[in-house]
Swiss-Prot record:
It is found in: Mitochondrion. Residues 17-39, 73-95 are annotated as: Disordered. This is ATPase inhibitor mai-2, mitochondrial. The gene is mai-2. One of its GO terms (cellular component) is mitochondrion. Residues 45-109 form a coiled coil. Keywords: Coiled coil, Mitochondrion, Transit peptide. Gene3D superfamilies: Single helix bin. The keyword Transmembrane helix does not apply. One of its GO terms (molecular function) is ATPase inhibitor activity. The keyword Coiled coil applies. The lineage of its organism: Eukaryota, Metazoa, Ecdysozoa, Nematoda, Chromadorea.
Amino acid sequence: MLSVSRVASRMTGVVARFSTGGHGDGAGRGGGSGGSIRDAGGAFGKMEAAREDEYFYKKQKAQLEELRKHIQQEVDHHKSQLENHQKVLDRHQKRISEIEAEERALGKE
């Protein structure tokens, strides 16, 4: 079994090899394998890489917004439930007070 440090040292070389060049720089320069335009590199490859990055940025932003809305709905629902439970709790405590008052009145007779 490989230790963490051995795996990390082996991965360092792999990361260094794949991180040369930028997105869209072309095959063999760190930006290829994204389609024929990106494989060619140059301005079109970089432009296509930028479009892909923008697409995924917008997609992630939309997903986060949807998640935020869903969580806000959950918060609103639980606040509503809390208010309902508080009303029921108050009603029960009032009824207990009334019963205790009746018990005291019966005890005095």
